[in-house]
Amino acid sequence: MRLKMPYGISNFEELITENYYYVDKTMYIEKLENLPEKRIMFLHPRKFGKTLFTSVLENYYDKEKADKFETLYGKTYIGKNPTKLKNSYCILRFNFSGINTENEESTMIGFKEKVSISIDGFAKKYGIDFFVNQEQTTEGIMRSLIEAFKLQKPEDKIYVIIDEYDHFANELLGFYPEHFRNLVSKNGRVRKWYEILKEGTETVVDRIFITGVAPITLDSLTSGFNIGTDITQDVRFNEMMGFTKNELIEILNSQDILKEEQEQILPIMKENYDGYKFCLEAKNQIYNSNMCLYFLNRYIEFGKIPTKLIDVNIASDYSKIGKMLDLCKGENRLEILRKTVQGEPINNNIVEKFNPTIEFNETDMISMLYYLGYLTISGEDLGMPELTIPNKVMKQIERYSEFEDIKDIEGLRKYTIVVAGNELYIEEI
């Protein structure tokens, strides 16, 4: 039976049990576990499979999923080469996407709700006698859980997984920077929550894995958290997310797509979805996995190359997060966008932590374009990364960003992004 394309599927158990194709990334479980550091941060642009990978970790390490190990991982690398820590943790998972960031109050309510739901589910799943007291602060709820776990589960350890740690923070920073600063400042509620999580690493929290897009909140949060290691630019993990060319060909073969057809569609996919490199030493470029699955899902369903090569969800997602570029107020912002759209390479060191309390400079903005996926590493000059637009799709999206900047400067009327065929167009509202 031909396996289904997992477009939009981010739950690993669902993907395996409901016969979706899985590009095996489980060898990276072993690589992560073998690192000396136990607290890991991994940043990538949107739509590269980060949420699915956190689900892979969750199912692998969850002690309550031991009886499902063979079903879920039997055909994978890690199923044939299990590590000593498999199915040995209580998994506490948070996902901070979907929070209403209209104002500080709604943001904090949403953050507390996300934390409360995760903690309540965790307590019920692992049989912890614990009540989420909504009268407590968010950090108070976290502290109480850690204390209850320590008393009731002295033999167990917690693996904390935080997906999209910066999602709501990025939206705040792009649209309401003052709200952002208040929440992550020294006395901010979000900052205090991370401080309690840090305290937990001294007792019951053994491992942490965090995903996000940009290190925009790291400088604000981690002086209180001291997160271990950011492996974003570690060559060993360049291919942990997204697809390599060989992985993409394996997908095509699994769908019985003939070689003649592959020769027709692979150049199109390469031109539009390939081109990403996240560290200087990497040899292989990476395809955006979500864009590839969008294309293949339609190609298989309709038997022809899709008319629209750009997923409208991706286009709107990137244009929305691109609001963070407004942090750079200098005149060079527009010039940088124009240079990149014209295909000119830019040599620039990549900033590892942003400080949003001060105005972004040119280096910060170029680095932000790299983290958001607008630019990628294409080479080096005297040890400095050379950055260019990775593919045609991102070039179209960045042209939209350039137009938005012109609109802001010239005070024109509001416009919106429209996907038509293989192009992005600007339409007056």
Predicted feature locations:
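Phosphate-binding site recognition
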Residues: M1-E398
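Nucleic-acid nuclease catalytic cores
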Residues: S401-I429
